[in-house]
Amino acid sequence: LGDMNFLGMQGNNGPIWALIALDCGDYELPDDANYIREMLVQSVLNMQLEDGGWAIAGDTADADMTGMALQSLAKYYLHEGETAAYAVDVNPAVDAALDLLSQMQFDDGSYGTFDGSGNIVPTSESISQVVTALCALGIDPETDERFIKNGCSAIDALMDYYVEGGGFRHLLDHDRDGMATEQGFYALVAYYRLLNGQTSLYDMTDVKLEGVKAEEPVDDTDKSDDTADTEVEDTSSG
């Protein structure tokens, strides 16, 4: 996790998901590695664009990447009355990103990403990433006015991509898609957890791990093969 050159091989995704992985449980870092967490946070902040967003590559903000970046920074965002536990102040960056996401939302409540021609196309995955990010920050994507356009929330937009019988589409005119289904359902799980006062999607500190003792293997190597020493009685007549 401390090798930023290695993490950077995946592009902007690397530090973002490394930070999410590090923070998903109560993991203790060695005393000489406490700098890693703040280094990852700072790395994510350093990738932020001037308009408040994050890009897959280049200098044009993308809703998916901005949503993912916010998911990684949510733990460090200070709500009113909270005390800072870490040295890095992420609030200005998060607030700027939220302002941008409000502006990026389409009139039907959806979000999009770039297609092969450089056009921004609404996709269910883009909506899913924004919904997951808002839930991680304690923001209700169904009721917060910043993320409602023409009476349509991000949740409304996501459900437009739902396929009857189970699953989600990538694009509105497509069939059921694996990645769209995965992200659509975990976005709804994130929203469910928010509504029920549970930890955010990637905060698994509420999971109790119980060790399971493996059964002792049965050693039958010393057993003799009785059949090998058994004489067979000839019962044939004649």
Predicted features and spans:
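Alpha-helical scaffold repeats of the Armadillo/HEAT/TPR superfamily
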Residues: Y35-L40, D89-A97, I148-A154, S200-E215
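Short glycine/proline-rich, acidic loop/turn segments that cap or connect secondary-structure elements
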Residues: N150-E164
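An alpha-helical repeat/solenoid feature that recognizes helix-turn-helix modules
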Residues: D3-R37, M47-D95, F106-F147, V163, ...
